[in-house]
Amino acid sequence: MSSTKKPLVLTILDGYGHREEQQDNAILNAKTPVMDVLWQQQPHTLIAASGLDVGLPDGQMGNSEVGHVNLGAGRIVYQDLTRLDKEIKEGDFFTNPTLTAAVDNAVKTGKAVHIMGLLSAGGVHSHEDHIMAMVELAAKRGATAIYLHAFLDGRDTPPRSAESSLKRFTAKFAELGNGRIASIIGRYYAMDRDNRWDRVQLAYDLLTQAKGEFTADNAVAGLQAAYARGENDEFVKPTVIQATGEADAAMNEGDTLIFMNFRADRARQITRTFVNAEFDGFKRDKVVNFGDFIMLTEYAADIKVACAYPPASLTNTFGEWLMKHDKTQLRISETEKYAHVTFFYNGGVEEPFKGEDRILINSPKVATYDLQPEMSSAELTEKLVSAIGSGKYDVIICNYPNGDMVGHTGDYDAAVKAVETLDNCIEQVVAAVKAADGQLLITADHGNAEQMRDPATGQAHTAHTSLPVPLIYVGNKAVKAVEGGKLSDIAPTMLSLMEMEIPQEMTGKPLFIVE
C-alpha cells in the first residue's frame, strides 16, 4: 500500500544521561543488553543538554522543560532563568510595569504583598535570587506587609538543603525591618501537577487561611521540626510561621499575590485554585478576591491573570514545520511528561497542530515512583508500537519518564529497575520500527539516573545532572554521526533524515549525515 507511512520515531528517555563512572550509576549498572548492543553497533554520538547549550546559565543542569523546548525549536532558546537573571542584573526587573503596578496598588490600598514560590537555588522551576529581588522591589516601593510563602525543594537540590535559604531570607527581612517568612511547605503539596487535589488543598488552606498541621515561631525552627518528623524538604508538611503576638499572614481581599515560579507545568494547578471561579478540584473554604494576582511567566494561555514576563513566541518549530508540509505526527507519553512532548516541544503552543495526534497514558497513582519504577511503560510501549505499525504517521515523538521520575526519588535500586524496564521497552520499539521500515532516534532531555548519590555530601542525589546524553540512530539509511551536538540539533537532524528543507529559524545542524 503506497500510502503507508514509514515513521521517524524520536524516543526521549527522560533523565537518561551518560556517565563513564560506575559508582552510583543506575544506568551503567543496570542490565541493558538492548541499549548496549545499539551503542556498540549503531551510529551514535553524545550531545550537550545543559548550560549555555540549552540557553541556561553556564554550568546549570538541564531540565525537562528546557530540554523539550530546545528539542522542538531546533535552535538554542534562552530560558526564563537566563532572561530573568539578565533583567535583575541590568535593573530592568525593578521597573517591570506589571510587578511595580501590583505592588503600588497594595501600597495605595494598605494591603499586603504576598510572594510565593519555590525557594531554591535549583534554577529549574524558580530561583531564590529572583524571589530576593521581588522582596527588595516590594520593600523599595513602600510595601509595609510583605509575606513570603516558601515552597521547599529537595528535588532539584539536595534533600535537606533549605535551611541556608530560609536563613538568608530571615536575615534580609530583619535588615529591611519589614516583612517575614509566613509559611513553609514542601513542593510535593504546593507544586503537584498530577491532579492530586488532596495535596494542593493543604497548600491552598495554608496560604489563604494560615491554617496548617504545624506552627513554628520562625522558619528555621519549622524546618528543623519537619526534619525531626522525618520529612525532607520536598515533603515538609504545611507549617504556619507565626511568633507569639504576631498577626497571621492569611491572604485577604484586595491583597497582591505574586507567584515567582517561572516554569509553568508545576505552577498551573495551584494557580487555578486561586483564579478559576469554577474551580472544582476541592471545596475552597475561603476564596480570595485579590487586588492583583501576578504570574511571573505565562503558566497557561487559559489562565487569565496578569503576567510579568509573557513568552517570546517561537516560529517554525519542528511540529509547526511538519504541519506546513502536510505531515502527520503523534505525541505520546505518560501524565508526568505529557506537557513536555506537547506544550513545551511545540514552543509553548497549547493547541495541537493540524495533523498532530496525542495519546496520554495515565501515570500510576502511587505516592512516589520508586514504589512502581516501571510506571506505565508497558501500556505506553503497547500504544507506541501500535502507532509505529499503523502506517498513519510521518513522525512519532515519545517520552518515557522513568529515568527521571524514579531518579528523583533517590532510590538507587528502583532507578536500576526503571532503566531495565526501559531496555525491554526499547527492544519492542526497535523491532516495530524495523518492521515498518522506519527510522528511530533514541536520546534524552537531560541526565539524572546516572548519578544517584552526591559524592560531596553522601546524600542521595535526586536532582538532574549537567552530563551529556546519548543519541543513537536505528533505521533504513546509512548514516555517519557528527560530534559536538546539542539538543537543538535534533530537529534539523530529523528534517534532514526525512529529506525535508530546514527552516532558516532553525540554527541547529544535522548530527547524522546520510552517506
Curated annotation (Swiss-Prot):
Its EC number is 5.4.2.12. Pathway: Carbohydrate degradation; glycolysis; pyruvate from D-glyceraldehyde 3-phosphate: step 3/5. Keywords: Glycolysis, Isomerase, Manganese, Metal-binding. The keyword Membrane does not apply. The active site is at 64 (phosphoserine intermediate). Mn(2+) 1 binds at residues 404, 408, 464. Binds 2 manganese ions per subunit. Substrate binds at residues 125, 155-156, 187, 193, 263-266, 337. It catalyses: (2R)-2-phosphoglycerate = (2R)-3-phosphoglycerate. One of its GO terms (molecular function) is manganese ion binding. The keyword Endoplasmic reticulum does not apply. It comes from the Bacteria. One of its GO terms (cellular component) is cytosol. Gene3D superfamilies: Alkaline Phosphatase, subunit A (3.40.720.10), BPG-independent phosphoglycerate mutase, domain B (3.40.1450.10). Its cofactor is Mn(2+). It holds the Pfam family Metalloenzyme. InterPro entries: Alkaline_phosphatase_core_sf (IPR017850), BPG-indep_PGM_N (IPR011258), Metalloenzyme (IPR006124), PGAM_B_sf (IPR036646), Pgm_bpd_ind (IPR005995). One of its GO terms (biological process) is carbohydrate metabolic process. Mn(2+) 2 binds at residues 14, 64, 445-446. HAMAP family: GpmI. Belongs to the BPG-independent phosphoglycerate mutase family. Catalyzes the interconversion of 2-phosphoglycerate and 3-phosphoglycerate. Monomer. PANTHER family: 2,3-BISPHOSPHOGLYCERATE-INDEPENDENT PHOSPHOGLYCERATE MUTASE. NCBIfam families: pgm_bpd_ind, PRK05434.1-5. This is 2,3-bisphosphoglycerate-independent phosphoglycerate mutase. The gene is gpmI.
